[in-house]
């Protein structure tokens, strides 16, 4: 009796184990997340943010509507208000996709540089703090390209006025005109303007760099105004009406130029020792007979500063969410069912082999059966046991 009960218990345990393993095999293609039992009433389109179709495994086709509070409702796709809501949400999603938005990213902290000749202002003077004295302004080289003259033959034209370095009289200074140089030969004089772009290193050095510049420059080449006063007065702004209020730096025009072509030297070696933070751009403005400064600064061996444009990129807003409905794969589901069935059959085979081995081990040979007496046979209870059971033959 005991071996048979143990065998039945093993069979029941194996059966329940197989039922547990194969409980979901017949639902291999079922991916229905929301089961719709009741359809909802009409919902205003202003409260809806998204819709999607339910899965094919759900059986009854329905539209899943999602509200702003992320609640889901089932709706009948055949109703008119459901179709209008779907069109409204499709139009809203398409508009958001076309107008994805724009963000700008700054690559570095480079600020756009303004050409001094076209603006008429010096970048260093614009960036000067309010506490700067007039001495710093007078010692600062301007970035304005001075008006150059090209006298041909015996032509006499008044050059641009020079503040603080013009050899004209006070009456000519009040009128804004300098002395007229006379030349019998062909001469070409180019006004040299040294443009210094502002940097943090130049700002930190302060006025000591400008004092060093004044000490190293040669007096006959560049004449700097030596006025130093902390209070500005209208009398210091002497010159033509087109000149800026601060003092300008200009090379003095030589009156005697026997050569056919002469250009004033450019002193840039004092700016080369200022470190990597400061960049010196020597520029030579071509001569012209007009009284307006040249709009372009052309320098041999130097390029115009390039302004890096910010990078524009388009990106979808974070609120725009794309819901991808998974499509059930019939082949994968069939493959899973086949694997489960094979596993079930293999487990049954193993269980049968185990039961057969158990019965063969527990069985007793025929010689161990007792003798038959008067139609009754003595059968031992188990192999090797001394207790017998009388079995009628």
UniProtKB/Swiss-Prot annotation:
Entry GO terms, CC: cell body; cell projection; cell surface; extracellular region; extracellular space; membrane; neuron projection; neuronal cell body
Entry-linked Gene3D superfamilies: 2.40.50.40
Protein location: Cell membrane
Glycosylated residues (UniProt): 33
Keyword Phosphoprotein tagged: no
Tissue-specific expression: Highest levels in brain (neurons). Significant levels in kidney, heart, lung and adrenal gland.
Superkingdom of the source species: Eukaryota
PTM statement from Swiss-Prot or TrEMBL: A soluble short form may be released by proteolytic cleavage from the long membrane-anchored form.
GO molecular function annotation: CCR chemokine receptor binding; chemoattractant activity; chemokine activity; CX3C chemokine receptor binding; CXCR1 chemokine receptor binding; integrin binding
Signal peptide: 1-24
InterPro entries: Chemokine_b/g/d, Chemokine_CX3C, Chemokine_IL8-like_dom, Interleukin_8-like_sf
Segments of this protein annotated with the region Chemokine and involved in interaction with ITGAV:ITGB3 and ITGA4:ITGB1: 25-100
Pfam families referenced in this protein's UniProt entry, alphabetically: IL8 (PF00048)
GO BP annotation list: angiogenesis involved in wound healing; antimicrobial humoral immune response mediated by antimicrobial peptide; autocrine signaling; cell adhesion; cell chemotaxis; cell-cell adhesion; cellular response to tumor necrosis factor; chemokine-mediated signaling pathway
Subunit structure: Monomer. Forms a ternary complex with CX3CR1 and ITGAV:ITGB3 or ITGA4:ITGB1.
Protein name per its UniProtKB record: Fractalkine
Organism: Rattus norvegicus
Gene name of the encoded protein: Cx3cl1
């Amino acid at each position: 009796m005991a071996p048979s009960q143990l065998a039945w218990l093993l069979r029941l345990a194996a059966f329940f184990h197989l039922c547990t393993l194969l409980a979901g095999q017949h639902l291999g293609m079922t991916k229905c997340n929301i089961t719709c039992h009741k359809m909802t009433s009409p919902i205003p389109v202003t409260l809806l943010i998204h819709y999607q179709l339910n899965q094919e495994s759900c059986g009854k086709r329905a539209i899943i509507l999602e509200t702003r509070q992320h609640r889901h409702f089932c709706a009948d796709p055949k109703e008119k208000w459901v179709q209008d809501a779907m069109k409204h949400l499709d139009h809203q999603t398409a508009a958001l996709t076309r107008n994805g938005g724009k963000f700008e990213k700054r690559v570095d902290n480079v600020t756009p540089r303004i050409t001094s000749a076209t603006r008429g202002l010096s970048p260093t003077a614009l960036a000067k703090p309010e506490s700067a004295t007039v001495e710093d302004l007078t010692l600062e080289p301007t970035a304005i390209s001075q008006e150059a003259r090209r006298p041909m033959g015996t032509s006499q034209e008044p050059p641009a006025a020079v503040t603080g370095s013009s050899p004209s009289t006070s009456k000519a200074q009040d009128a804004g005109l300098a002395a007229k140089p006379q030349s019998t030969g062909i001469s070409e004089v180019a006004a040299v303007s040294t443009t210094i772009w502002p940097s943090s290193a130049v700002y930190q050095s302060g006025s000591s760099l400008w004092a060093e510049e004044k000490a190293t420059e040669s007096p006959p080449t560049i004449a700097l105004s030596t006025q130093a006063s902390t209070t500005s007065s209208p009398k210091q702004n002497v010159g033509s009406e087109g000149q800026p209020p601060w003092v300008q730096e200009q090379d003095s025009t030589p009156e005697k130029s026997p050569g056919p072509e002469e250009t004033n030297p450019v002193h840039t070696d004092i700016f080369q020792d200022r470190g990597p933070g400061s960049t010196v751009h020597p520029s030579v403005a071509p001569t012209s007979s007009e009284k307006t400064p040249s709009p372009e600064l052309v320098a041999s061996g130097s390029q115009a500063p390039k302004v890096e444009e910010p990078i524009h990129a388009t990106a979808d807003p974070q609120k725009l969410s794309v819901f991808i409905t998974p499509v059930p794969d019939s082949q994968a589901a069939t493959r899973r069912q086949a694997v489960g069935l094979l596993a079930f059959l293999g487990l049954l085979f193993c269980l049968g082999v185990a039961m057969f081995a158990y019965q063969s081990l527990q069985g007793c040979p025929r010689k161990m059966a007792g003798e038959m007496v008067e139609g009754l046979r003595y059968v031992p209870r188990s192999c090797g046991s001394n207790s017998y059971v009388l079995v009628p033959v």
